[in-house]
Amino acid sequence: LLKHDTLGADAAQALKHTLLMFDAFHDVKELAAAGNAHARAVMQSWADAEWFTSRPQVPESLTVTVFKVSGETNTDDLSPAPDAMTRPDIPLHALAMLKNRRDGIEPEEDGKRGPVAFIAGLKDKGHLVAYVGDVVGTGSSRKSAANSVLWHTGADIPFIPNKRFGGVCLGSKIAPIFYNTLEDAGALP
C-alpha cells in the first residue's frame, strides 16, 4: 500500500508503529531505496524509534489503589488452564482470574468467576488499581496471565478492541519471565 496514491500516507502512518515486520521489512527497505517517499518516512520513523518515543511519558508519581493478593499467585490462578479455550477472548477469560477461593479473595462464583465486581469497585475510587502480591507470576501461562491482570488494571489501547496496556503489578518476588511479559505489555512491574 505504500505505493498507492491515496492510501500510501495512511499505510506509512500505520507501519511507523508496527514492529514485527519479519520479511516485509525488506520490501519497505527496497521501496525506500527506490525513492518511495512513504517507505523512506517509515524507515526514518523506525530509525528514530517513534513507535517508542510517541508513547505517553511515565508519570513522576502514581497514586494507586491496592488490590492485595496474599501468598503465591501462579499463572494458573490468573489464567486457569480449564478456561484455556477462552484465552483468545481476553475480557471473557479475565473473568476467571482468581476464580478459586483463597485467603483474602472471595470469588463471585467459586471455581467459575473471580472477584470482578470487587476489582471494579476498587477502580471506582478513581485511581489505577495495582495488583500486589507476595510472589506473582510463577508458571507457564505468562502472556494470558498478564492479559488477565491488565484487563482488570490496565488502560484500553486506542483502536485495538479487547486489549489493554499499562497497569501496575507489584510483588516481593515476580517471576522473571512474567516480569518481562508485563514490561512488554507496557505495565510497571
Where are these regions (language model features)?
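Fe-S-dependent hydro-lyases/dehydratases of central metabolism
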Residues: 13-189
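Alpha-helix N-cap/helix-start positions at coil->helix boundaries
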Residues: 4-9, 36-37
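Alpha-solenoid helical-repeat scaffolds
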Residues: 2-5, 18
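Extracellular cysteine-rich microdomains
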Residues: 1, 9-11, 98
